Amino acid sequence: MKRRLIIAASLFVFNLSSGFAAENIPFSPQPPEIHAGSWVLMDYTTGQILTAGNEHQQRNPASLTKLMTGYVVDRAIDSHRITPDDIVTVGRDAWAKDNPVFVGSSLMFLKEGDRVSVRDLSRGLIVDSGNDACVALADYIAGGQRQFVEMMNNYAEKLHLKDTHFETVHGLDAPGQHSSAYDLAVLSRAIIHGEPEFYHMYSEKSLTWNGITQQNRNGLLWDKTMNVDGLKTGHTSGAGFNLIASAVDGQRRLIAVVMGADSAKGREEEARKLLRWGQQNFTTVQILHRGKKVGTERIWYGDKENIDLGTEQEFWMVLPKAEIPHIKAKYTLDGKELTAPISAHQRVGEIELYDRDKQVAHWPLVTLESVGEGSMFSRLSDYFHHKA
C-alpha cells in the first residue's frame, strides 16, 4: 500500500458523530476535577465529548425535563399544528390554587381562564421554569399531560436518548423518570440547532407575568466573562442541583451538563470549570472539505495520466490546541496503483489522521473524477512504461 502525507492539521481550514470522544486523542489535557453526580462537556459543532463522568448514569432530571417539553412544543410549531401566536385558555389543572402537585414548586403564576399565547407560555416554561406553563401547553397541544408525556418519550426515542424516560411534563419527582448527562447534552444540542424561534428565550434574565417579576435561575447568564446564552437549571430534593449551560467563544459553542451538585452555586461553579477548560484547551477545526482535492495519483491505461482524490464528506473535529502542531493527515491507497477505467466517487483508499504516531480517525478516500479507458496507442505506451 502507498501512504501519502497530505498536510499538517494546523493548515486545514470536519461533522463527526457524537460517539467520538476526546479520549481518542492520546494527548488530551487533564480535565478539571468536578464535584457532582455526573457531568458532560460537549462540543456543539461535532457532538464530541471532551470530558465526562458517570455520563450514562440514570438520574432525576428535575426541571431539565422542561427542555424536552419545549422541544415538543417547537416540533408542533415546525409541523404547523400550532403557531407561536396561538392563544391558550388556561385550564384548572394548570392553576396552582388548591393543586397539591404544585405546592412549593416553580410557577409562572397562571390563573384558570387566563388567555396566553404559546410564545408567552414558552417563556414562562423556560425563564420561570413554570410547571403551570408546562401543563397549559401540554393540554393545548396533546389534550392532556399523559398524551404529551407520550410525545416526549417518542421524541426521546427518535433522538436516541437511551438513558431517558419521562413520566411528567414538568420534571417534578416521579417514579421511573430519569435521564443522563449524556442524553441531556444531546437534547440540548438538538434544541440549539432546531429551535430558532425559542432558543433566544433561554438567555432572557427575567420575566414579568401577572405583575410578578422572576429572574432566570441560571446564574451564569450574568457572568460577563463566559458568554453563556442558555440553557436550564433544575432542582428537587431527589435530584440535587442540575444545570445545563451553553457558551459561545468566537465561532465555537460548548455545552456543559452538571447533575447532582450540592448547591445552586456549586452547579454554576462546576459548569464554569468545564466551559473554561474546554475553551482554553481545545479548538474546532475543519479537517476535510467535501469535493476538495487532497492528492493526485498516477492512473494507468486511461485517457489522462493523473486523477484527483479527496472525500465526499465534510469533517469537523475538536483537537487539543497544544496538539495541533503534531496532527498529520495521510492517505493510503487500497492497492499498489490505479488503473482505468474508473468512475468518480469510487473508494480507492483511506484518509488517516494521526496525533504524533497514534491514529485518531480515518475516512474513505475517493476519486473526484472519472477516467475513461485510453486509446490503443496510449494504453500500449502505458504498458511499456509500466513494465519498464
Curated annotation (Swiss-Prot):
Entry binding sites for substrate: 232
NCBIfam families: PRK11397.1
Subcellular location: Cell inner membrane
Family, per entry: Belongs to the peptidase S11 family.
Membrane topology value: Peripheral membrane protein
The name this protein goes by in its record: D-alanyl-D-alanine carboxypeptidase DacD
A GO term, aspect molecular function: penicillin binding
Pathway in which the depicted protein is active: Cell wall biogenesis; peptidoglycan biosynthesis
Residues spanning the signal sequence: 1-21
Gene Ontology biological process terms from the UniProt entry: cell wall organization; peptidoglycan biosynthetic process; peptidoglycan metabolic process; proteolysis; regulation of cell shape
Classification of source organism: Bacteria, Pseudomonadati, Pseudomonadota, Gammaproteobacteria, Enterobacterales
Keywords: Carboxypeptidase, Cell inner membrane, Cell membrane, Cell shape, Cell wall biogenesis/degradation, Hydrolase, Membrane, Peptidoglycan synthesis, Protease, Signal
Main function: Removes C-terminal D-alanyl residues from sugar-peptide cell wall precursors.
Gene Ontology cellular-component terms listed: plasma membrane
Residue positions of the active site: 63 (acyl-ester intermediate), 66 (proton acceptor), 129
EC number: 3.4.16.4
Gene: dacD
